[in-house]
Amino acid sequence: MHGLLLAAAGLLSLPLHVLAHPQPSTNLAGRGVDLDAYRMADRSSYMSSDDMKLKQPAIASLSGGNYVDTATEVVKRMMPGMTFRMVDDHYVGESGISHVYFRQTMHGMDIDNADFNVNIGKDGKVLSLGHSFYTGPAPDKAPVEKRDFSDPMQAFHGACKALNLPINADKATIQTMNEHEVMFMGTSGAMSDPQGKLCYMAKEDGTLALTWRVETDMGDNWLLSYVDAKETDKVHNVVDYVSHATYQVYKWPIPDPTEGKREIVQNPWNLKTSPFTWISDGKTNYTTTRGNNAIAQANFDGGEDYLNNYRPDSKNLKFEYPYAPNMSPPKSYIDASVTQLFYSANMVHDLYYMLGFTEKAGNFQVNNRGQGGKGNDFVILNAQDGSGTNNANFATPPDGKPGRMRVYIWTKAKPSRDSSFEAGTVIHEYTHGLSNRLCGGPANAGCLNGMESGGMGEGWGDFFATAIRLKPNDNRNSNYVHGEWVNNSPKGNRLYPYSTNLQTNPLVYTSCNKYNEVHAIGTVWCSILYEVLWNLIDKHGKNDGPTPVFENGVPNDGKYLALKLVLDGMAIQPCKPTFVQARDAIIDADMNLTKGSNKCELWKAFAKRGLGVGAKYDPKNRTGSKAVPKECQ
């Protein structure tokens, strides 16, 4: 995340996310604090490829040199006179789109929620851009020169008090890391030493606040708390990084124990996406559930010391352990639980890699084989995590730090059910890692912390989980419920089943006006994407195999094409996107990948659920539209 300070032009933000699976509201685990009240506003703007041609033709035609220089010139022209730095996570995606990310600065310090992303197409010209740069009045002098800010320890105590964090800091000391960053040493209660960073943040009222960004990893919540640097009892916003051989397993796409039997699979990895297999990192070969992509273990006490936790070990690499849904207690089948979790997460890794979530895009791997990105960040998979029940979550720090998935025991059935065995739970949680790493760039894991953008994070998780579980005989009349097995309920844990029937599922874009909770908003987003899925399947057919087949870089069926376009759209859209901006990014992704051959199928799907041409975002009064472009009528 180190970059050059550049004089120039403008947009918005950079953090990590813990996202929980099915909770009705985002509460700070066990402490009664409503984190939704601290969410950042979704304030980014996005210019699609069509917008660029109409409104910024000179910039749209920029080309020549390398893509980084072109992107930098775009920001300079769009935001003249502003200062910014390039974030060190630019890359060329598998679809040929180059993604470059910038952070606005003021007096040599970051404006932590002011980001700019530029997407360069395969032809070297500007495809689209998004930004949230601050354009209000600037402070006269640098606060470091005036020393016009509080001691960081006061801000640390302010964050702990406001969020009721169980951190003991009576003997804490400050270790200075650089001019603007400190570490709080000698504390207890957090999973690692808390950190502080002096930075600006753009407020909703159009002004700029100087803040201490206090980072505290509490396990179920990994928080970036923006504490006012003058009034340390005031917390402006909070970002939560947590979103919330042979293997005997329920083989993909079996979603849960009610729909299939366990079987023994041999060497299930794909050597193109996991060249070291699942049980090696290229340096060490393991005989347990550990490898380059993930490390899985029991975590009965809910603690952070995963390396020393129990995991099954098989010298002959036969991870074959007994399990049946009626077994109890859960600890009696922990080997099977860890093995299933390890299998499912690695399957997700390999599929997402094929679709474009590679090393340079910020995926989760220890050894990146010189392919770009930052390594040393496999996913920590905690089975039967003792820190909670009836839930699951995923912590997504920036690229280079391990992701962490916690899956819990569910007590809504007798005997209790282990969510390691519900593939949809694992896919949903892993997809939080995907969307948080792609949106805003690998170094910025906090771009989905707004209400609508956070809702899309939940919706993407449901969408990938639902698309992956489709059966061979399914058609557009097939309905799917999310989380029915762990919930022991045919209704699952969402408002409605996912369906193309508006009577079965009446949700439309304007339904978001009555919801103020990310899982409800996510259900709306997934309902819209479900229409996209079936429009593309009806046109291109459905590949029922576990992996896509590509022709000239394009999946040759509708299911995997839908997943590919949605994934590419995540990387194209701005930080803290809205439904409208994410829609445009998916359409731009298709323009890049297929030259827009699916434009009308996409528009008709969006319009059916009220996200047509005239749809407009307002957090309290969204405007719906069923209109499509003239050429699609």
Swiss-Prot record:
Binds 1 zinc ion per subunit. This is Probable extracellular metalloproteinase 5. It is found in: Secreted. It holds the Pfam family FTP. The active site is at E429. Its EC number is 3.4.24.-. Keywords: Glycoprotein, Hydrolase, Metal-binding, Metalloprotease, Protease, Secreted, Signal, Virulence, Zinc, Zymogen. GO terms for cellular component: extracellular region. Disulfide bonds: none annotated.
